[in-house]
Amino acid sequence: MKLSNKAFVSSILALCMVLSLVITTYATTRASAHLDSYRASLTPKSSSRIAITVDVDGTGLMDDIGATKIYVYKSTDNEHFYLLRTFDSKDYPAMMKHNVYYYYDTPIIFQGVSGYYYYAHVDVYAAKDGGSSTRSYTTSSVQASNNPSTTQIAE
């Protein structure tokens, strides 16, 4: 019977260790005092256009929330990328919203070149009562195509 008790206690300790990892993982998903979560993605569209979607969740009602800058990179081989263009929220006001809990939009659609690869580095932002938080997110690369139904995310 003692073996069963040892096995039971060992199982409980193992479960506690696994749960502590889950709690640690959850704690790291909260980005900052103002950013609850954030992500961005690129989507190939028709005629080699690329859409940039940004999703930013605030920790409450934010004075300002969205993306401050979006850096777009281009490659012919999906290995060697160079900076193609920078989008700034000062020039593209659709990249930022005011007095909302979250930001979810596709503020930028740019013209790509069929066969070329693109990824974006997005600086997300949230501000409330004079305090603010900024974090960065890098998307997966996608390939521009004249026929996006055959385009897949490049890994």
What are these regions (language model features)?
Residues 1-12:
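Bacterial N-terminal signal peptides that target proteins for export
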Residues 11-20:
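Bacterial N-terminal signal peptides
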Residues 19-34:
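Sec-dependent signal peptide cleavage junction
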Residues 69, 81-98, 138:
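Solvent-exposed serine/threonine-rich low-complexity stretches and specific carbohydrate-binding patches
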Residues 91-121, 127-128:
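Short, solvent-exposed, Trp/other aromatic-anchored flexible loops in extracytoplasmic proteins
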